[in-house]
């Protein structure tokens, strides 16, 4: 196997990010390319199970990741530069001599103008400038990317539709997290009101974690919860995809989520959209969904087509 591709996953830490990495690994592992994974020393999944994958590990913190071409060993940077391509996950990477791709996975630096996100946006734009392609998943993300990079854009996200029976077990499930973007305080208040007004309905608050060591257990636990509910409540401010929305829809749940850009792919056949940050609106939409006589939904299933990347190398 003479051809190789590097996946730089040093910036990946969320469950959603790990799922995207797994999707890429599964496709590339079946191709003609030798897979090389560059990761930090905190990552325990998903790379420890395949002995055919070449692994390069760094202990450098996130601040150094845009400069890994300087701080990695000569052996490691030579291995990377000798590969056919590198795909940077987590919004930005570092300069290399091969064909490079940057996958945008976090919209916050493009939306929020605090000190941290201004710095991140600088590195993102620098990575976009250095990259041959900017890879994105869904169309609303492309609208956030500076127009001077439009010629580099490559879309890999696909949404499939299909009719599915709505789950018969009645209840509401929402995912909460310490991450500010997940808007968990708002979700907590809305679900509290629903439980007070309608105590007969089951309310489940699933606590997500950024700890990768427990990610597989988390994913299994969440997938087991979906069939026990018929309503999925979402509250995030921003999403590049919002994987739980599609997982819940595919699992037979009706979606209640804010009327935000990332919800543009859903309609009234599979969702109710509430006014963002409006507790009364969200509470009313959940109650309307619970009292609906709907039996089937037009479910949405999300996936990535990594062959588009491979074909462009």
Which role does the model predict for each range below?
Residues 169-211:
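Conserved catalytic-core segment of nucleotide-activated headgroup transferases in glycan assembly
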Residues 237, 249:
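Aromatic "clamp/platform" in nucleotide-sugar-dependent glycosyltransferases that forms part
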Residues 254-257:
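Short hydrophobic beta-strand element within catalytic cores of glycosyltransferases
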Residues 277, 284, 290-313:
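A charged, aromatic-enriched C-terminal amphipathic alpha-helix characteristic of glycosyltransferases
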